[in-house]
Amino acid sequence: MPGVTVKDVNQQEFVRALAAFLKKSGKLKVPDWVDLVKLGRHKELAPSDENWFYIRAASTVRHLYLRGGAGVGSMTKIYGGRQRNGVCPAHYSEGSKNVARKVLQALELLKMIEKDPNGGRRLTAQGTRDLDRIAGQVSAASKKIVQ
């Protein structure tokens, strides 16, 4: 659909559709250790979803589409959470820097994002075009369900 952007569609459906697109394309380089790693110090267990790397990559691209100029440090703050310390008070803890770095590097190899000269990463024209195309597909699918 012309004129449909990422901001116009349901974000959960969009992230799922983009993750499916990244997995189906087979070009996203997934590290060998994805089934062993926790996503942050504040997590007790590794993710239960086996496709979590694709979902994280899709979520990261969506975030860069909406805000842009985010780097590894910004992504660790976004994916951080509450660190439980037993009987001591809970505090905020950042997400895994290695996971954020590997996701950004994998997306750079796909030419969806590039390094911003002002710091961080930003979407390329090809990445924006792909995201808008997938948003159009999600919008068309949701309109088909409503009718």
Curated annotation (Swiss-Prot):
UniProt function note: Component of the small ribosomal subunit. The ribosome is a large ribonucleoprotein complex responsible for the synthesis of proteins in the cell. Required for pre-rRNA processing and maturation of 40S ribosomal subunits.
Keyword Transmembrane: no
GO MF annotation: an example: RNA binding
Subcellular location: Cytoplasm; Nucleus
Name used for this protein in its record: Small ribosomal subunit protein eS19
Subunit structure: Component of the small ribosomal subunit.
Pfam families to which the protein is assigned, alphabetical: Ribosomal_S19e
GO biological process terms, semicolon-separated: ribosomal small subunit assembly; translation
GO cellular component, one term: cytosolic small ribosomal subunit
The species this protein was found in: Gillichthys mirabilis
PANTHER family associated with the record: 40S RIBOSOMAL PROTEIN S19
Family statement drawn from the similarity comment of this UniProt entry: Belongs to the eukaryotic ribosomal protein eS19 family.
Keywords: Cytoplasm, Nucleus, Ribonucleoprotein, Ribosomal protein
